[in-house]
From Swiss-Prot:
Pfam hit, one: tRNA-synt_1c
Keyword DNA damage: no
Family: Belongs to the class-I aminoacyl-tRNA synthetase family. Glutamate--tRNA ligase type 1 subfamily.
Known function: Catalyzes the attachment of glutamate to tRNA(Glu) in a two-step reaction: glutamate is first activated by ATP to form Glu-AMP and then transferred to the acceptor end of tRNA(Glu).
Motif, 'KMSKS' region: chain positions: 243-247
Top-level lineage group: Bacteria
Binding site for ATP: K246
Source organism of this protein record: Paraburkholderia xenovorans (strain LB400)
SUPFAM superfamilies in the cross-refs: An anticodon-binding domain of class I aminoacyl-tRNA synthetases (SSF48163), Nucleotidylyl transferase (SSF52374)
Entry protein name: Glutamate--tRNA ligase
Length: 469
């Protein structure tokens, strides 16, 4: 019987979650969906001092926004302490761990001596029981840690789905602390128990965990388990070539939503940030799941490219429905000084979005470009002097009169403009520029007939006539 694929995303809720972090959710999610398996969310919150509920909320919100639904969880490590203690007791009973009374000061001094001798700093096994070995007397008043009896010889090996065959000599590994003096278990121990209990078959995570892997494999095997398939993803770099982080200016996942990016664009971009399917750059979520495999995960660090994300987002904005985009654009108007009442009184927002979306890289940009439809024009004096000249005023007056009478369609407006140009022997920019300026307050708009149609006859005519009065 084939074992069902079970993957997991196991973030620590200690603050910021950026694109590099959430990629470690996207790939295991996609693999689980591709293999018709199970995707588990586990919150590794044993760092009590740094873990916050706000960070948990940010993780859940980011996953929900990107559509990374999980089948089981969220499981919180702090709620599994009884289970960890049960396994620790089992390991003590089986002689897999031992009490170590070496103080932090003694350990620091030991490591310093090793460094001075040119040796790799490591615990020397002072308190490790061995046949015929006499252990020191436990010092009074010292709470011991629990250390795992790592194998003394042999190698730990695994075939990493990204990095290939990795072999680590057990002589390189010291006996890991798996429970602190107060009895609380450590990270590497909790991860192993969780992966075992949750029957995780594939661990897809950042390559900053590679050094933890041999230790985790040894603990896993001591508990009678078999290692999952590991796929260690190379780091995501920012545009300056540094590891992506808040300190180096990375934006949070939800920051992209708040900047006007569409979730499907971010998912598409993230998918290509360390994985490829031939030369395909644009693909749907469904296509991504169908194509995704571990064999085509990149082996080199991926570098974030903001221009490429903007290009992808512009593509998805063009493809998106106008009603949806209008709703997504609404929250951005408040920051532009435009309230709901002003939106209601101005041009139809859905139609405005339809006109402007082909020129925008973000939904926020759509709102910024749409603002002219919802507030009074305020052209600068220099532009007025340049474009609204005495020579063009008669043409503006005739155009206003013509627009009062025509059917209010884009074609009829275009015909009125063309007739006015012919009557006054003007070129289109000579008339369109002042009209744009007087009606919209700017010379930068899409096609003049489309813009005027959305402003509406009353607004267009009154603004031109007011300027001529």
């Amino acid at each position: 019987m084939t074992t069902s694929v079970r993957t997991r995303f196991a973030p620590s809720p200690t603050g910021f979650i950026h694109l590099g972090n959430i990629r470690s959710a996207l790939y295991p999610w996609a693999f689980a969906r591709k293999m018709k398996g199970t995707f588990v969310l586990r919150i590794e919150d044993t760092d009590v001092e740094r873990s916050t509920s706000e960070s948990v909320d940010a993780i859940l919100e980011g996953m929900a926004w990107l559509g990374l639904d999980f089948d089981e969880g969220p499981f919180y490590q702090m709620q599994r302490m009884d289970r960890y203690r049960e396994v620790l007791k089992q390991m003590q009973d089986e002689g897999l761990v031992y009490l170590c009374y070496m103080s932090t000061e003694e350990l620091d001094a030991l490591r310093e001596r090793q460094r001075e001798a040119g040796e790799k700093p490591r615990y020397d096994g002072t308190w490790r029981p061995e046949p015929g070995k006499v252990l020191p007397e436990p010092p009074a008043g010292v709470q011991p840690v629990l250390r795992f009896r790592n194998p003394l010889n042999g190698v730990v090996a695994w075939d990493d789905a990204v990095k290939g065959r990795i072999e680590i000599s057990n002589e390189e590994l010291d006996d890991l602390v798996i429970a602190r003096p107060d009895g609380t278990p450590t990270y590497n121990f909790c991860v192993v128990v969780d992966d075992l209990d949750m029957r995780i078959t594939h661990v897809i995570r950042g390559d900053d965990h590679v050094n933890n892997t041999p230790r985790q494999i040894n603990i896993l095997r001591a508990l009678g388990g078999e290692p999952p398939v590991y796929a260690h993803l190379p780091t995501v770099l920012n545009e300056q070539g540094e590891k992506m982080s808040k300190r180096h200016g990375a934006m949070s996942v939800m920051g992209y939503r708040d900047a006007g990016y569409l979730p499907e664009a971010v998912v598409n971009y993230l998918a290509r940030l360390g994985w490829s399917h031939g030369d395909a750059e644009i693909f749907s979520r469904e296509q991504f799941v169908e194509w995704f495999d571990l064999e085509h995960l990149g082996k080199s660090p991926a570098q974030y490219d903001h221009d490429k994300l903007n290009w992808l987002n512009a593509h998805y904005i063009k493809e998106a429905g106008n009603v949806r985009l209008a709703e997504l654009a609404r929250p951005f108007f408040a920051g532009l000084g435009i309230d709901e009442a002003m939106l209601a009184q101005g041009a139809d927002l859905t139609a405005v979005v339809g006109l402007l979306k082909d020129r925008a890289s973000t939904v926020k940009e759509i709102a910024e470009n749409a603002a002219m439809f919802y507030r009074a024009p305020a052209p600068d004096a220099e532009s007025l002097t340049q474009h609204v000249t005495d020579a063009v005023r008669p043409a503006l007056a005739d155009l206003a009169a013509a627009l009062k009478a025509v059917e209010w369609t884009r074609e009829a407006i275009a015909a009125a403009l063309k007739a006015t140009l012919g009557a006054h022997k003007l070129k289109m920019p000579q008339l369109a520029m002042p009209v744009r300026l007087l009606v919209a307050g700017t010379t930068h708009t899409p096609s003049i007939d489309s813009v005027l149609m959305l402003f509406g006859r009353d607004v267009v005519v009154s603004r031109i006539e007011k300027a001529l009065a």
